[in-house]
Amino acid sequence: MLPSIVISIVLASFVSAESSITEAPTTTAEDNPYTIYPSVAKTASINGFADRIYDQLPECAKPCMFQNTGVTPCPYWDTGCLCIMPTFAGAIGSCIAEKCKGQDVVSATSLGTSICSVAGVWDPYWMVPANVQSSLSAAATAVASSSEQPVETSSEPAGSSQSVESSQPAETSSSEPAETSSSEPAETSSETSSEQPASSEPAETSSEESSTITSAPSTPEDNPYTIYPSVAKTASINGFADRIYDQLPECAKPCMFQNTGVTPCPYWDTGCLCIMPTFAGAIGSCIAEKCKGQDVVSATSLGTSICSVAGVWDPYWMVPANVQSSLSAAATAVPSSSEQSVETSSESAESSQSVESSQPAETSSEQPSETSSETSSQQLSSITSAPDSSATSSSSTTSTFIRTASINGFADKLYDQLPECAKPCMFQNTGITPCPYWDAGCLCVMPQFAGAIGSCVADSCKGQDIVSVTSLGTSVCSVAGVNAPYWMLPASVKSSLSVAATAVPTSDSASETASQEPSETSSEQPSETASQQPAETSSEESSTITSAPSTPEDNPYTIYPSVAKTASINGFADRIYDQLPECAKPCMFQNTGVTPCPYWDTGCLCIMPTFAGAIGSCIAEKCKGQDVVSATSLGSSICSVAGVWDPYWMLPANVQSSLNAAATAVATSDSASEVASASESASQVPQETSAASSQSANNSVASAAPSNSSVSAAPSSNSSGVPAAPSNNSSGASVVPSQSANNSSASAAPSNNSSSAISESVAPSSYGNSTIAQPSTSTKSDAASITGPITTDKVITNESGIVFTSTVIITHVSEYCDQTSAAAVQSSACEEQSSAKSEQASASSEQVKVITSVVWCESSIQSIESVKTSAEAAHKTEVIASCASELSSLSSAKSEAMKTVSSLVEVQKSAVAKQTSLAAVQSSAASVQLSAAHAQKSSEAVEVAQTAVAEASKAGDEISTEIVNITKTVSSGKETGVSQATVAANTHSVAIANMANTKFASTMSLLVASFVFVGLFI
């Protein structure tokens, strides 16, 4: 009994030590693309593992689904993460092994394997510990004790074999095997039963009971798994056979009807069946026995093709070694029937004709040359043509790949973007690979094909052309789903390409480029030559990033669900930039060219230590304390959402150490002085913020004029100047800019030496209850006194990187100033609200740590009291005294921890109140923007203002939800009766946790000594 108490305390300590993991922040904004990520629903009724299979589970297994997901680092809704956690899977598996027997165990484990396979987990899909797996295997062979052991099974003889035997010959002897194979399963069974009426009902019942195949759980239309792009959840024969059956030689078709029940796969899961040697071996042995020569090559090529399309790695179709040997021997054998040989050659001729007709560069349209090409293709070509999808073929509706190509699957998608020197290199022979000529992903992973292209490019191109070709190759292979390094070039070819990339092109190509560029520029935009040309040249010279090739609308790559093929900064930075601390934002502009990733590929950039290390080192250098924690948490969050595995954001060890050190450092005194300067009198604000006003105004102008292109606001002397709103701890500020007569025509808004006045007042509050006042009458009249319209310059960069500078004429000056001023107030309030959210999240995280210490203290107190009771019974006064001392220390630590919990709860309440008031500020400012926009009579201004109103409303809705969450935390945290502690609870809670750890060490030594002593005494 006593040793078990020691073990429980040790386990509790391990749990408390691991509870310091910072969870990735959750986002619920409607415009956040992650909230509609297609393959993971962010909620669950039970948990992400149980929800989708609960209704199909046996009754005995259903109570086992309600296990605690808190023992894992996974979100409770994340199916894939829960599947690979042995702690969670083991708890469910142990429960099933205990409560279920026989077929119920098989059904439950098959469903678990199925849902984990659908979620994208690798073999063995559901990660159950070995001892639990043994228990499940034993339970699966046990006989159920229930009296409901199916009477129907015993009363109905096993007609399953009879049904299978009767259906197989019928399909083989049929004059139209393709139609039979593509019909529905129910149709086939009905035809068989009509031929053998006596055994129809037993066969149907027995096959249902004896089969170990569990079909995929049915799901409603709004479940994202029902639109999972690459796997159809049904099959006529099975997931392997359906898509290639019509293209198989006649001798191989009967081999497709193997039993999928010998695998843990759902019968429709192509990828799972491809990697199961038991299933692949049965098919391969049958083909080796029934087929010879070219028929074996065709069948194995089709098998490799379908497995490659399903995303399986090399060698794609996992056939056992002995079966592979049999297939190789059969492929070299000569068919015994001359009729079979003639039939095979005619099919090959038809295949070669279709391939030739799709090649644009060939001149085989004349009748005489067609006959010769047929003959040569029969003798030399070992390429298996792409399956022709027809109206009766099931593959025409389930495939996610285009089964044809003009050149080949690799070249088609990038040919138009290639430099001229590289285009001839694309016409390499795909016959040296086992790939279908149209399969981009398969061709990407074949070194012999990639090496031929790479060697040709290295010989034909130099300098920037090499970089463009390799970037395009990497891009198209990444889009095709190939893992890093995407385009599998041999090492020797990579070296040749690297050397060629550093070489300087000859003068002929340089002069040709120089002669083409000016004429092209002058013909497009004569009035903007000066601003376009430098931007174009610099972007072409400095950028090594090549965007993904554009593809037609019917190409499935254009609707690839989880990756946007463009980015403003890069795929890592775009989605978290607005939430980052200011100190970390400059760190996002690292060069993606040091990686093989497309610049827009979030997941790829997350796993590249060179890119992640550069960002991490910059953050460690520029940020301190909570800013470091926020930045790294956002990085982990975006990488987790992109599907990267733990630890999500792959930082090098030395950079991680630097970030840990920076996270514990205290921010410098600059921030304190900045706060102090912001709280000075209103008369000093214009002089202190004149430089900042210009920058803020430029941002306001950019936001007031929406466009499809990105807007780059650069501070200049002729930009409008509107000051940003003061922070919540300032006493109020009034900025009075004006404009002199000398520069009234060139400035968008007044500077400090002009004559007009625009004022804005913000009332301070302890919780940030700031309110915005409408511009006064005198302000409007002063702004209206400006004669005539004013102008401002707007700098726009389009998608091609060309910079335009346009002039905006502002006629409603007063309303324009009101709108930009209100936009600045809303922007400031939004930033302060984000800061309050961060403060709340930090306090919540610290509260979890302290509550963990409280729980540990309570557990330790109970254990020591038990030891003390035993010592009192044994009259061991020394042990009793030691226990009393430890109980006093632990009680003191628990009391301090409870005070800290109360303090952290108050901090969170304060942060929520602050966010609520700032949401009101945003709403008020948005109303001012909308009113001013309507007064301007500008549709663009109204659209921007309406967006601001929507954002302000959304901010208020989010705050309401968070208040409910905080209220629940307070009630569960036992707020009543706890005295108020200091608000700066960060250091205090860490001290409490450290003290608890120290007490744990001393208590453990006391407990071990006491247990040994009491045990010897007894």
Curated annotation (Swiss-Prot):
Lipidation (GPI-anchor amidated serine): 989
Polar residues bias: start-end ranges: 148-164, 767-785
Induction: Preferentially expressed during the mycelial growth phase with only low levels of transcript detected in the yeast form. Induced by iron starvation and ciclopirox. Positively regulated by BCR1 and RIM101, and repressed by TUP1. Expression is also regulated by EFG1, CPH1, HAP43, and SEF1.
Region annotated Disordered, chain positions: 147-227, 338-396, 507-557, 677-785
Biased composition (Low complexity): 165-221, 509-553, 690-766
Location within or outside the cell: Secreted, Cell wall; Membrane
Single GO cellular component term: extracellular region
Primary subcellular site in the record, as a coarse category: secreted
Chain positions recorded as heme binding sites: 78, 269, 439, 601
Annotated signal sequence range: 1-17
Membrane topology: Lipid-anchor; GPI-anchor
PTM characteristics: The GPI-anchor is attached to the protein in the endoplasmic reticulum and serves to target the protein to the cell surface. There, the glucosamine-inositol phospholipid moiety is cleaved off and the GPI-modified mannoprotein is covalently attached via its lipidless GPI glycan remnant to the 1,6-beta-glucan of the outer cell wall layer.
Domain comment as written in the entry: The CFEM domain is involved in heme-binding. It contains 8 cysteines and is found in proteins from several pathogenic fungi, including both human and plant pathogens.
Family note: Belongs to the RBT5 family.
The name this protein goes by in its record: Cell wall protein 1
Organism: Candida albicans (strain SC5314 / ATCC MYA-2876) (Yeast)
